[in-house]
Amino acid sequence: MQNSFSLEEFIEEIFNIEKYEQKVKSAKLKNELLNNNIVENRITITDIDLMSGVQFEEFLCEYFNGQGYQCSTTKASGDQGNDLIAKKGELTIAIQAKCYSGIVGNHAVMEAVAGMKYYSANRCMVITNSTFSKSAVELAKANGVILWDRQVLTEKLNEV
């Protein structure tokens, strides 16, 4: 018995093969992009701008864990001015995270200093996706508080 195809069936079969080949090419390209283009998976400052405060804290904790720290979030209320504690060897950093659209003022710096003492940390930081007021920068300098503003945070994101 001989298989016979009509011209229409033959054309349809060729069309199906071409569709299948296109799907394979698309899948290969997608896989190549995902495996070779790590930049596509990076978090950008724009992504951070869309985060909630809690998401920003969780992101920062993951960032510090990736830098070799053991980082944990503090309890949401009564955190004594800090959102994260990052430890690496003898170094303990109390971190205040501010995911804001406005300017971060003195209060965040004061909270970081208070939290550093409360958590017996060696250092303290305030990290924001925004900017700091001039007086916050002066207060931080006088108290040894490390400040990461939008520019520094963007640089850190590009290093990862």
What are the residue ranges of the model-derived segments?
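Mixed-charge (Asp/Glu-Lys/Arg
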Residues: M1-V160
